């Protein structure tokens, strides 16, 4: 006969310890499936809640960054408008400049401030920053031309054209004659 060993150690200290050792299946029997589904659904809901909170925090941070960018861009826009108006007012002798100045003032008065009306439904960083960079690239130049060179009056255009017309190219005929004359003498 085979001898059987009987464990004489202390029983479990608590039900929780027995559950962690053997699992819920032994203690609950048929109710195991419903309990695990309820607990897993609670855990999944809690996980979704935690994930939603993280997404909300990220969205708030991106919203703060975007609002700061909008504020800085509006300030930059205002300073450039002031500089442009100041530089245009320094050249009042050109009638074309005055017309351009009036056009700029009318366009700024008629257009609403669209920057405050921006509403972002998604906080997709690539789309937002990509659009902003494309706009910046199209606005800024590496070496912007001077305002005095951009605004040229009709008189200055005529002077430049006269200078170009008076400058003549030297004919190539004397050069060719010199080359052929040199070849004949040698």
UniProtKB/Swiss-Prot annotation:
Give the superkingdom in one word.
Eukaryota
Q: Coiled-coil regions in this chain?
A: 37-91
Alphabetically sorted, this entry's keywords are: Coiled coil
Family, as annotated: Belongs to the WEB family.
Name of the protein: WEB family protein At3g51220
The taxonomic lineage of its organism, from the top, reads: Eukaryota, Viridiplantae, Streptophyta, Embryophyta, Tracheophyta
């Amino acid at each position: 006969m085979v001898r059987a060993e009987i464990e004489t150690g202390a029983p479990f200290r608590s039900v929780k310890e027995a559950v962690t050792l053997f699992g819920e299946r032994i203690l609950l029997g048929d109710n195991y499936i419903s309990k695990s589904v309820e607990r897993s659904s609670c855990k999944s809901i809690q996980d979704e809640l935690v994930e939603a909170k993280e997404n909300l925090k990220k969205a708030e941070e991106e919203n703060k960054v975007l609002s700061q960018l909008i504020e800085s861009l509006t300030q930059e826009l205002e300073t450039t408008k002031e500089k442009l108006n100041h530089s245009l007012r320094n050249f009042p002798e050109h009638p074309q400049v005055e017309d351009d100045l009036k056009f700029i003032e009318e366009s700024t008065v008629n257009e609403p401030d669209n920057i405050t009306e921006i509403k972002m439904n998604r906080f997709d960083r690539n789309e937002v920053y990509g659009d902003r960079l494309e706009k910046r690239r199209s606005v800024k130049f590496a070496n912007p031309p001077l305002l005095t060179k951009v605004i040229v009056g009709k008189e200055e255009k005529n002077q430049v054209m006269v200078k170009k017309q008076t400058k003549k190219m030297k004919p190539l005929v004397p050069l060719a004659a010199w080359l052929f004359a040199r070849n004949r003498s040698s």
